[in-house]
Amino acid sequence: MKVSLVKEQTVRNYANKHAEARASCVDFINRIKTADWEKPNNIKATFGSVDLLGKGTYRAVFDIGGNNHRFICKYRFGKRSVRLYVLWLGTHAEYTVLCDKEQQYTADNHEKYI
């Protein structure tokens, strides 16, 4: 199924604030635009370095820019398409702090980049 990236502009704004991640952010967007997913494991086929979080969160953590940045997105598989919602964007160091506090399951900072 076709994948739609919700809040694509948020990723672009993040890239503008983190120039070193710009090319990787564009690559992330382009991969999403050409993705064809039927189930969550297909996300791993598109992005080899992605972690699917458990606990019924329907969240995926994407490694961006050589593992220097992380994006947390929520995925929703519908009848005809998949929607990928950008929830959290940050550096690897910020993500580590998030995980130390076990907040990766609930984190949401995308408004910072709107």
How would you name each of these model-derived features?
Residues 1-68, 77-83, 92-114:
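Basic, Lys/Arg-enriched alpha-helical interface segments
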